[in-house]
Curated annotation (Swiss-Prot):
Span list, region Disordered: 1-23
Lineage of the organism: Bacteria, Bacillati, Actinomycetota, Actinomycetes, Bifidobacteriales
Pathway noted in the entry: Isoprenoid biosynthesis; isopentenyl diphosphate biosynthesis via DXP pathway; isopentenyl diphosphate from 1-deoxy-D-xylulose 5-phosphate: step 2/6
InterPro entries: IspD, IspD/TarI, IspD/TarI_cytidylyltransf_bact, ISPD_synthase_CS, Nucleotide-diphossugar_trans
GO biological process: isopentenyl diphosphate biosynthetic process, methylerythritol 4-phosphate pathway
Site, Transition state stabilizer: residue positions: R43, K50
The UniProt record lists the keyword Coiled coil: no
Name of this protein: 2-C-methyl-D-erythritol 4-phosphate cytidylyltransferase
Known catalytic reactions: 2-C-methyl-D-erythritol 4-phosphate + CTP + H(+) = 4-CDP-2-C-methyl-D-erythritol + diphosphate
EC number: 2.7.7.60
Entries under CDD domains matching the protein: CDP-ME_synthetase
Amino acid sequence: MTERDFDTPVETPTVQPAPAQGTKPAQTVPVVAVVLAAGFGTRFDPDNPKQLVSVGGKPIVCWSIDAFEHCDRVSDIVVVVNPKVRGEVETLVGEMGYTKVRVIIDGGDERVDSTATALDMLATAGIPDDAKILIHDAVRPFVEQSAIDGSIDALDQFTAATVAYASTDTVLLTEDLGDLKVVKSVPDRPNTFRAQTPQSFRFATIRHAYDLAAADPDFHPTDDTRVVVDYLPDEPVAIVSGAETNLKITTLEDIPTAERIAEEILGRDPKEEARARMHALLAQAAGQMHR
């Protein structure tokens, strides 16, 4: 697949009409979704990569690409794949008619390597420093549009943000003692969240964080937020509300749950969806009135 040009923003007029109620403002910088689909999880079927497993009649990777393809505010999509399934993903992208997928690139051995490869490619493509980059695990197929919108909006105030879901369980921080783990501390539950994706950044921020991390051969982060937290500690990372349904499909045992979520999504009544959106708008308006 050949690389297509990334969208460049048009000059912003001096005066713009206010957006219609319930719509989101247009973006004046590129908003690039990086879909990470390069993993071959050891906890899944090694002969059947989970990104290509069908859930609800559609490959998992397509669910994730769909979410960004259908978001009007996302301008470009980069898909990072394992070379072993590159052909299959290219075929799917062509069959599904994704117009925002600019390039499909090979990932690295670890997640952090795949992100670094994508950032290098974006730099080569001339992406501006203030571009908004949303990095998403392909195996989180049910990310909601509200999480994507929230991530884009958060970058108007912060240079880094992550979707996260408030923990309903007490979280224990542990340390080793002999052959067992023991409790070291118990953080207050209201302050504990389960990290999800997308994790979003202004391009200059995440690029700088990765440049600093590259000098540390012992650093192996499990997500991109960790890179910013560890190497740019003065950069706050905003929390964007996630959802329990934004699960990460890690093992075969996750598939039945994913199928149930897919059935619920596919079976939603359009009238019920419209009613839910109206309730959300009313709740948002009420919240603004009480500020």
